[in-house]
């Protein structure tokens, strides 16, 4: 019995140290990764080098669980010599995922947000607003499961002839309870 208790204690300590958030379905609780990844892009020609950053979050409120990805970006140079079209396509796919203890992630809901016009029209965007938030449909919260947000970004740079590039981003910390 003592070995089982110590093993449970050790496992719990590792989980808590790993950044797990505990939730109550009645209270609003969020679990966001400080940074879920970024993409530094050097464009052809005189378009400004830019950094695109992402943050995945999972949220529980009023018995529902939601996942979203925020995207911000900035120029890495002082002046943009060419403000022309930078992308033929820029899409973020956000997934709400669940897992049982010791299991693997299962996608519950997913959505793809087309941000092509927004990233082409704005050389930078640092605000966290609904326009740059890709929100997957919510699901009924089950406190016996672990929940997370995961995402990927797919983009096609105008004029580089490389086609669509897809990058998997780091998921949010797990939310449980």
Predicted regions and their residues:
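Secretory targeting and sorting signals
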Residues: 1-28
